[in-house]
């Protein structure tokens, strides 16, 4: 077995871990390990974290003192796949036979989506296929709070059922290849993920021209990208979308905390905003055309928001 795989489960479900390990061993393909990322356990037992769990999932990204240590740990593994089976925006149900059923997004996404690969092993296989074809080390279906060595690979993030579709689709692989070929890593525009990306890559200003670009929904989906909100606050996905629609005509500013993009430098505010420059054209991926077209219809009467 020449493929060293690590799978990270989000909670300490021993039955699930046992089932997963049994399935992985049956493939006879991977020298695999299963770790837990139990944020709740960490919060309650901060001092005992290292005694109970092999990977310090949260500390490694949010506390600088532990960043280097965690980075060294991750560098030992060829493939990293995280399975966040219990987070707010998406509900996964693991059946006894290892099948995964994906329920609808809570809140904005009303369409019911189901996973196109039926079981856990297929998910992992699909993830590894994407990583192999795109030279990616880690796939995380939610927020990748992983420090990493950019010389060893790129962190790629998404959630199931986003506009790009499933992990093992050619569309997703196309997106990965595009992101990598342009020195982009695919991250959400919410929380502090962009800030984290800039930190681990040593990016201090927008002059570096290496930016986190989201091809997923980010914090806002298409239903929220409307003229009436004046585009005051944008997710990274929104910004990429607008740049594709109106190349070079948009002005974007990143908030100092790294988690909000503004469409213009607002007046009457003391907030420090960093200008963002897009120097790459962002393609429309298969499956996104209908969203672009719908957005274009919405924008016909309000192009002033785009500084045209």
Regions found by a protein language model. Name each.
Residues 34, 80-84, 137-142, 205-209:
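A structural signal for short, well-ordered beta-strand segments and their strand-loop junctions
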Residues 4-5, 12, 16, 20, ...:
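C-terminal catalytic/acceptor-binding lobe
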Residues 35-83, 88-108:
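Active-site-proximal specificity loops/subdomain of glycosyltransferases
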Residues 2-8, 31-34:
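Hydrophobic targeting segments
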Residues 12-14, 62, 86-89, 144-147, ...:
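Short, solvent-exposed loop/turn segments at secondary-structure junctions
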Residues 8-10, 36-38, 140, 243:
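Short beta-strand/turn micro-motifs composed of small residues
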Residues 8-28, 41-44:
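Short, well-formed alpha-helical segments that are part of the catalytic scaffolds
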